[in-house]
Amino acid sequence: VPGRAAVGHHSGGLLCRRKLLGVFPHDHARSRAYRWGEDGLLGITNRQCRLCFALALWNEKDPILNERLFGLTGLEGNPGEDVKEEYFYLDSTPTHSYMKALYLYPQAAFPYTELTEENLRRGPSDPEYELADAGVFDENRYFSVLAEYAKADPEDLLIRFTVENHGPEPAVLHLLPTAWFRNTWSWGC
């Protein structure tokens, strides 16, 4: 239909639909400036959302740093937009004076392509293809990363990361705590 995006799952139609909806895939994320605190993995911001802090991880197997949650756009995921990671918000006070979250990071290379292609292949009535379905947690070969934030007073934030290797062998994990100022100067990036 002239002037409308293709509906099929072939790459040309997917690209057209992304442009119409103004969304971009995870692969573009590392080329775009962070805009908010929630852009980062297990991130937090100050009250004005000016100073942001988050964690980046690298297991020496992935081709890129793991600094943002991997997800599928509404056009890639068979149920619609969908994060394909294992993370859990465990605790928080109403004032956020204490917060705790858990993230599970595979020791194997993250299956970006497999998750995208398999979910594209499936229809809306099919079950989702999740990270665990790709076998990356087999034999408990993953790291658990526990993030805790606590306010010592209104202007003092304490941060603690506790990492545990659940696998049967030693494995390398690089932790990169990252602070940045929110991008307010260029909204088109």
Predicted regions and their residues:
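Anionic coordination/interaction segments
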Residues: 1-189
